[in-house]
Amino acid sequence: MGIFYVAEANRKIKTLELKAYDAMLNFDKAYNETQSSGYPYDFLSIMCTTCHVELAHTQEEIEALPNGTELLGVYPDNDIETWRDFLHYLAQALCSFAFINREGKLQLVQYAASPVCTVNNTHRFTSSFSDFVTRYTAINSTNRRTNTAEYYALDPDDALTMNLEVNPLLQFGLDETRSRILTNILNAISVINYVPFDSETIGDPALEPGDVLTFTGGQADETQMAAITSITIKVNGK
């Protein structure tokens, strides 16, 4: 649900088949480095103005995110081709993921540590749950200036490592600044403690990607949480 733009329409005998996309497609516009350094809100404002997408946040809300008040610079030797690439790196630096909300605005969301609702076995038709829990206790990030892979870990380091690869927004500044930013990212993703799942449920229009759920009944472990990564909605069906 939300605001979508029709890209293709195919007429059939009794129906009209539509293929539509949300405003995230606008960020596939070629990247133009109009500003080489700035604060996250500055970059988001330029990006949204250039790509004609409204930002869902105030400056105060962006600054409240981890690393939201850090001065970032764009490393000249980068692989950024579109504004969508740039958004990927910026959201990563802000310990968030980006999506277009139901109002058609760009929204950044952090990983949550508490569920928004519980789905019991009478509200789902099918479900399968992984036998392992996805959680992170370390990150790996490449420093282009030194051409070294830097490893940051919690104690104990007994889970997965998230590979941030080369983020062109995290290359400038003092070593202490880079270390602080990466430590903030590590602390933010350490709240991830989700069981991968797949479930066919009674439709709940309030749910969105990124929402965290708990399941009860059947084979579900009610002590574990699961995060929605994608939603498929069938109109007039399950």
Describe the role of every protein-language-model region.
Residues 1, 37, 67, 72, ...:
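Feature targets compositionally biased, intrinsically disordered low-complexity regions
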